[in-house]
Amino acid sequence: MEQRVSIRTIGGIDLWVEEGGRENGPTLLLMHGLSGTGEIWGGVREILAEKWPGRWIIPDMRGHGRSAHSETYGIGSHAADMAALLDGADNPVLAGHSMGGLVGIMLASGLFGITPKTVITAGVKVDWTAEEHAGMAKLIDMPVRWFDSDMEARERFVLVTGLKDTVAPESDLARTGVVEKNGKWRLAADSRAATVAYADTRDIYRAARAPVVLAAGERDRMVTVEELQTLDPAARGLSGVGHNAHVENPQAFWELIADAAGISE
C-alpha cells in the first residue's frame, strides 16, 4: 500500500496518522512516549519498509505533535484512541515507548475490543516517587512557554524528550514537536498530557492477557531492567542505549519486534 498521512477524528479528537506497508499481512501499531511525536519512529520506519510483512500505523497521540489537544489524557483515553485506529485488524502487533508502551500494555487487557498478538515495550516506568509525581503536577499546571524563534522551540523539544545528544534541532523530528501561533513558537505537546504519570503500571500489567515484552536501555534513567524484572523476570536490557532506545538503535528495537512477532530476518 502507498504510504499516506491522514487526519482521523476519534472520540471528537483529530489525530494525525501515518500508514504504510503492505495490504496483506499483520498490522503493527507504533506508539510514541510523552511529549514525543510519531516521527520519533523514523529510524524504525525505514526498517519496516523493507522487513515488515504487513501494514504499519504510526499516530501522533492526542495532545501531541500534529494531533489536536483534548480535555482528557488518561491512559484509558489513549488506549481507546489506539483501539479505534486498529478497528478491523486481527491480532495486531503493538509496540510502544514509555507512555506508548503502557498504552500497549493496557490494550493487552482485551477490554478495548482488540486482541493483540503481542506487545513490545521499551522504557515503561514502573513506579513513581512522591517527588516525581510532584514534578509532574507542576508540569501539568505550568503555563505555556512561548519562544521567539522556531529554533529555540526545537531546542526545547529535543531537551524535554531526552533527545538532546541524539537528535538535531534542525531535524524533521524536532519540526513535528513544535507549533507556531502569531509569530511565536511553543512545544506541540499539551503539558496536561503528563497526567498519564498517575496510571498504575503494576495494576495495568497484571491485567494484560496478551504476551508483553518489557525492555529498557542499560542507560535508561527513567526505569531500570531490574525494576522491570519485578513485573517479568524475562525483561530485557538493551546495551549501549538510554531511555530512547528506539531512536538510538532502531535495529535493536526492530529485533525485539521481529522476535516477538515471529518475523524471520
Describe every region a protein language model picked out:
Residues 1-29, 46, 50-54, 90, ...:
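Alpha/beta-hydrolase fold catalytic core
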Residues 13, 18, 42-45, 51-95, ...:
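Active-site loop/oxyanion-hole signature of alpha/beta-hydrolase fold enzymes
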Residues 34-46:
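The serine-hydrolase catalytic nucleophile loop
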Residues 96, 100, 104:
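Gly/Ala-rich beta-loop-alpha elbow adjacent to hydrolase catalytic centers
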Residues 106-109, 114-149:
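Flexible "cap/lid" loop of the alpha/beta hydrolase fold
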Residues 148-199:
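Conserved alpha/beta-hydrolase catalytic His-Asp/Glu region
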Residues 181-230:
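Conserved serine/cysteine hydrolase catalytic core
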Residues 241-254:
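Catalytic histidine-centered segment of alpha/beta-hydrolase-like enzymes
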